[in-house]
Amino acid sequence: MQHVKELSAKLKEKKGFALKMLIGLDGFVDEIIHPVDKRQDYKTFTRIKTIGEFGERITKAAGLSTNIEMVTIQTKLGGNGPILSNALLEYGVKLTYVGALGTPDIHPVFHPMTEKAAAVYSLCNPGLTDAYEFEDGKLIMGKHSSLSSLTWEVCKKGMGGAEGIAKMVGECHLFGMENWTMLPHMSDIWQGIIDEVFPLLPATAEKPLAFFDLADPEKRTKEDIRRAMGLIGKFEQKFRTILGLNEKEVYEIAEVLGITISDSSTDKLKDTVVAVHKAMGIYCLMVHPVRTVCCAIGDEYFFTEGPYCAKPKLTTGAGDNLNAGFCLGLALNLDPLSAITLGACTSGYYVRNAKSPTFDQAIAFAEDWDAGKV
């Protein structure tokens, strides 16, 4: 694909960039888990390969009982904000993180990230996540009670009041408050920023970027989702606002917004993305299905195939890595097609290597992708 070939050259021109970003607001300790199908000995087992097989195992136990062994493969930092930030830090962004990393001490799992960050404000304890990984997807089992203490008042107290928050936000090229679904007070926090921080922000020649990721809103009510969409739209007053969704989420948001796409549509995804983008009135809507990436900006729609990986080493965090690459691309003033392609490269590298790429590694991955080596 020509745009993949062109991406590596464009990235080489951007080497040595200097960008500041402020990201929050969640934090999770993730355990990556493989459910056991058959165990051969105390060291060796075969995993349950698909979600369907896992579901069958559970269904067969109805009215009876069963025992499924779970093997922890890795314990790692989790949450949309930390994984997004970790990827941006690998790229060389000067980043401040605000969120649920542990109090009074930051949990050790976050230390590799916080040691690279320009500044860190930890406001409460992290949530806990068990991520059951399969070859065709993952099941996320979350424990979120600690996140209920993260309120607008707590944010102000921990960050120097509205004035302190305004100073941090005003210095950034990109600002993001992620994981609305799992943070029960996030809408109130956004409202607080709109009411108390917006009046303090300096005027700029070009509005900075603001990135939002809902993180699977299905578990929230339609009224909550509509309120969140309205608040995200208001950020357009001071920012070029980006909403990132997966394919499932964009159809859910369309339903909540009362958008209906004709059954005769030849490209339901494109029509849905364009309609939701228009309804929200924001700068950009970006959507990442499993094998592709697309976005709507202005009156244009952009699409690319991705470097699909049939047997990934790690999938939890792939979407956040894609978001990181896309946000970096826009912050570097790449064209939208190049930005979604950088997102695909970032995610593609991550699922193959179980870690986020450096800037040079992303360039090399784009070259390998263009050469058919991935």
Protein language model regions, located:
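A structural signal for well-ordered alpha-helical segments within the folded catalytic domains
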Residues: 79-82, 86, 248, 324, ...
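Alpha-helix C-terminal capping segments
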Residues: 85-94, 328-333
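Conserved post-catalytic alpha-helical subdomain immediately downstream of the catalytic base
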Residues: 284, 307-373
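Glycine/serine-rich anion-binding loops at beta->alpha junctions
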Residues: 74-87, 313-321
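Ribokinase/PfkB-type carbohydrate-kinase core domain
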Residues: 1-64, 71-80, 90-301, 353-374
